[in-house]
Amino acid sequence: SYKNLDSLSAEWQTEIRTQVGYPQAKEEVMSGVPVADQWIVLHTRSRKINELRTETFWLYGKSSHRMALYLNFLAPGALPEFNLVPGGVYEGELYFYQGVGALRALPQNMKWLDSTFLPSLCADIPVAMQSYRAVIQTHPFAEEVPLLVDNVRLVTSGNTHYLQDAGGVAVPVHIEETARVDILAITGGKPFSAFLLADAVSCELKTIWYQSEFYFWKDELN
């Protein structure tokens, strides 16, 4: 594709340049048109490799219904520009990177709100999987696809855990044992809503809502 770059759309040209190692400058990203909204922090992840900490934030826009991925890189002793708390809602703008099906974004003017909301959810697992396939068809480079699905419960068969919807459709799910025990204690085995990160093999269960309450589990590796 890189040899035929000039024949591709501007979005695909940017996407392929990014994939082969030509990152977009912050100034270039911030020159775009921002998406103003109320953003709920669905999940945060922290990884420390060779003294560099990478913080990952997944967000969802209340009005735009748009998913966003914010990456923050912190050197030793550095403080984050924005302290985004899981489950918190912030009013502000996100500047999205250019590219196909772009999720990565830079936040600006984020103000914490004393409120919350439940994102729009896929009605069941088949609808969620249809959403996953649509993302992969648009953006085959995607490694983690964010999904929101309603009315699922956690079930186990042998050593494998599954999310099962009301229709009996199930998908394998990866979940830490501590979180699994917590979810069963919180829900009593009843249905809940979930935020997942999906790939071609399985889904990772990251966040749940049960009776409108938000629950998350620390995702940190030092």
Regions found by a protein language model. Give the residues of each.
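Long, compositionally biased intrinsically disordered terminal regions
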Residues: 1-3, 16-19, 23-45, 61-222
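Generic recognition of flexible, low-complexity loop/linker segments
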Residues: 43-48, 56
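A short catalytic or substrate-binding loop motif that flags glycine-/basic-rich loops and adjacent residues
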Residues: 49-53, 188
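Broad gene-expression machinery/nucleic-acid interaction feature
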Residues: 54-56, 193
